[in-house]
């Protein structure tokens, strides 16, 4: 009799995905973040479910329902802060996961990469809508500013914005539909994650050297399950430290003031994980131009496989490309810092220069470095 793990129609799918999966023997800790993202998604769905049991999506009671969760519900405060800071952990893992894909050339798995980009957009949309739900000042004005960007679309812009709002301003209808979308999107994300994994397991994982590793594969369990558990423990340690010692570290104090359409906060800014894109948006004086730059700042990832000029897949043995990559990381950190600063000198010019550098590094310097390295190989 064969093992049920290998014969049962359902269990064998799990077996081929997480147990007997042939995995390269040399993948480093940068490959941990895929499983960590899965854990983050499960955590967000579970904490979100329990929050939804007590939350009311009505403009008059939304803010007080969040206060009620934190004060009156058993362990409500920890569920709320796990959910809020869990989103930050999710994005940290996401950025590292995408950065790993960039560095080691994982984008040559086209289907996996493209589903990943769709996932990134979906997660960003979900996080944005989640930020609106507590109905504080930053929630309300963030929703107003970001949804208003769609009015830059020619002809249909204004109609589209009012259609999304469900009225002539961000109000009860907006909050209700945002809650509905925020609830359903994580399940769509889960479905996309399954497709993402399906495409990945068609080709097998990449590895740091970027060369095929079919002749040197090891089973995923126990080697990488143990390795992933270590990553998980470190993630949980970081998350719990944040939640239990400084839960509001990454939040905005303005969101502890109930939403007031008559009073605009001095600095409207999104959560930290959107600041780089917000800085790119603000660096262009034209509204439509800013919106296009904002979308392109993420969509440019879809061009990366086309821009790959190198004869080698990974950047492991390409020092010039490594320099460009780390410049890009530094530039993104600069943009994140600028996005949180007021619109005044010298922040405006720094933001504009960092935005130009961001697109230049990806579109010009990365292919250029690859071409130079190709020529150096001939010597």
From Swiss-Prot:
Name of the featured protein: Cytochrome b
Positions bound to a ubiquinone: 201
Cofactor: heme b
Any one GO MF annotation of this record: ubiquinol-cytochrome-c reductase activity
Extra information: Heme 1 (or BL or b562) is low-potential and absorbs at about 562 nm, and heme 2 (or BH or b566) is high-potential and absorbs at about 566 nm.
Disulfide bridge map: none
Function of the molecule: Component of the ubiquinol-cytochrome c reductase complex (complex III or cytochrome b-c1 complex) that is part of the mitochondrial respiratory chain. The b-c1 complex mediates electron transfer from ubiquinol to cytochrome c. Contributes to the generation of a proton gradient across the mitochondrial membrane that is then used for ATP synthesis.
GO cellular component, one term: mitochondrial inner membrane
Main location: mitochondrion
Membrane topology: Multi-pass membrane protein
Keywords of this entry: Electron transport, Heme, Iron, Membrane, Metal-binding, Mitochondrion, Mitochondrion inner membrane, Respiratory chain, Transmembrane, Transmembrane helix, Transport, Ubiquinone
InterPro entries associated with the record: Cyt_b/b6_C, Cyt_b/b6_C_sf, Cyt_b/b6_N, Cytb/b6-like_sf, Cytochrome_b, Cytochrome_b_C_euk/bac, Cytochrome_b_N_euk/bac, Di-haem_cyt_TM
GO biological process: mitochondrial electron transport, ubiquinol to cytochrome c
Tree of life domain: Eukaryota
Chain sites annotated for binding heme b b562: 83, 182
Alphabetical list of PROSITE patterns matching this protein: CYTB_CTER, CYTB_NTER
């Amino acid at each position: 009799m064969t093992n049920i793990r290998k014969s049962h129609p359902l269990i064998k799918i799990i077996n081929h995905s997480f147990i007997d999966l042939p995995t390269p023997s040399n993948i480093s800790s940068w490959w941990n973040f895929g499983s960590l993202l899965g854990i983050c998604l499960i955590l967000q769905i579970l904490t979100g479910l329990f929050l939804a049991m007590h939350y009311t999506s009505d403009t008059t009671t939304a803010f007080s329902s969040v206060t009620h969760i934190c004060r009156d519900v058993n362990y409500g405060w920890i569920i709320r802060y796990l959910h809020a800071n869990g989103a930050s952990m999710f994005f940290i893992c996401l950025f590292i996961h995408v950065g790993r894909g960039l560095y080691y050339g994982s984008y040559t798995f086209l289907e996996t990469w493209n589903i990943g980009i769709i996932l990134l957009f979906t997660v960003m949309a979900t996080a944005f809508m989640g930020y609106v739900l507590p109905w504080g000042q930053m929630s309300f004005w963030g929703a107003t500013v970001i949804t208003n960007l769609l009015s830059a679309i020619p002809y249909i812009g204004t109609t589209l914005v009012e259609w999304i709002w469900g009225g002539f301003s961000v109000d009860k209808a907006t909050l209700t539909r945002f809650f509905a979308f925020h609830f359903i999107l994580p399940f769509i994300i889960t479905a996309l994650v399954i497709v993402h994994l399906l495409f990945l397991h068609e080709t097998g994982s990449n590895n740091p050297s970027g060369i095929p590793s079919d002749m040197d594969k090891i089973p995923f369990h126990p080697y990488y399950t143990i390795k992933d558990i270590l990553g998980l423990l470190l993630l949980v340690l970081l998350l719990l430290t944040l939640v239990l010692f400084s839960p509001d570290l990454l939040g905005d104090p303005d969101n502890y003031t109930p939403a007031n359409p008559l009073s605009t906060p001095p600095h409207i800014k999104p959560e930290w994980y959107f600041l780089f894109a917000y800085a790119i948006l603000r660096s262009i004086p034209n509204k439509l131009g800013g919106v296009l730059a904002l979308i392109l700042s993420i969509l440019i990832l879809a061009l990366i496989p086309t821009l790959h000029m190198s004869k080698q897949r990974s950047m492991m043995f390409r020092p010039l490309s490594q320099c460009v990559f780390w410049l890009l990381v530094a530039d993104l950190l600069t943009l994140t810092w600028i996005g949180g600063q007021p619109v005044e000198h010298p922040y405006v010019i720094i933001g504009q220069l960092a935005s130009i550098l961001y697109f230049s590094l990806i579109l010009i310097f990365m292919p250029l470095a690859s071409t130079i390295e190709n020529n150096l190989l001939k010597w």
